[in-house]
Amino acid sequence: MTGRVRAFDERRGLGEVESGGEVYPFHCTRIADGSRSIPVGAAVTFEVAPGPQGRWEAVAISRV
């Protein structure tokens, strides 16, 4: 999938990716390059997977 980083809190390591009107939360450990940081507004590719609470989360996040 493709989308944009809508929000990212570096202190907590939590963010959101928006794609096609849907919003997918993610943790910084899901950023594929291992950097644990990504700027708000960055274009990304990602996959979705069920998270621990059963909602879909962004994983394998890479900048385009």
Locations of regions flagged by a protein language model:
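Structural detector for short beta-strands of small beta-barrel domains
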Residues: 1-10
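A short macromolecule-binding patch
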Residues: 22-30
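Short strand-coil-strand connectors
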Residues: 18-20
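Short aromatic-glycine-enriched beta-strand elements
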Residues: 11-16
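Hydrophobic beta-strand positions in extracellular immunoglobulin-like domains
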Residues: 5, 44, 48-50
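OB-fold/S1-family single-stranded nucleic acid-binding modules
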Residues: 49-64
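Short nucleic-acid-contacting surface segments enriched for D/E, G, S/T with interspersed K/R
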Residues: 32-45
